[in-house]
Amino acid sequence: MYRRFYSSSSPVFWVNLRRAAPEGARRSFFTSCAWLLATFTTLAALSGCSAVPQAADPNSDAPEAAFAPRGPFIDAPTYDEALQRWQSPEDINAWIGARFRYDTDRAMQLSETQRQASGRMPILAPDAFFAAPSGVCVDVARFALETLRTLQPGVQPRYLMIEFDPVSVRGNTLRRHWLVSFERGGQHYFFADSKRPGHIAGPYASVQAFVDEYAHYRGRRIVAFSERESYERRLRTRAVAEPAS
């Protein structure tokens, strides 16, 4: 019987084990070691895949790496046929997650700076966006809203316009961001977000609750927001209530 302790990394340990243990016990021991090694290797790989995503880039409405295209979706050769196949916000959302590509150059063209210099640019119609699903936040929001109004008008889809503190990108001022809200079971949901394509946020008890959480996610202060029937309207709601006079 051995009274001295040997590390498992010590050659003496292996020699003692081979001398002391019967063949069946040795085989069981080495099998267990191999299983543990494989298990730890698998867990290490999985932990790398499920790492916490980085914080959102506050200077861009482009998708984050964590929201890369994933999951099944229903495709169609034309927009009209898609309207026949899709039934829900989830169908629209899955297609956006798989197909949408952010257009940084167009974002600069639609910036506050260039719009003041060159005038307004048209926002892509749903059929045009379906044929070439590249654009910016307001393009994907218009596509989702008008499509959802066709499929399920009862969920009351609306634009949600968010106004951030302005940032300057390539000398262009950016402050507004667009996505779509809808209601289900008395709760609020939000999707068609160019920052998180393929993601439906909710349920929330109120729009304000979502806006508060979204400001934290984006790392930017929201100074105003409004739910709108059209992207062309100019209504405004303060993000933080002013004290009573």
Residue positions per predicted region:
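N-terminal export leaders
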Residues: 29-30
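Secondary-structure boundary elements
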Residues: 57-132
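Active-site nucleophilic cysteine motif
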Residues: 92, 133-148
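Hydrophobic/aromatic-rich core segments of domains that either
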Residues: 142-216
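Low-complexity, Gly/Ser/Thr/Pro-rich intrinsically disordered linker/tail segments
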Residues: 216-245
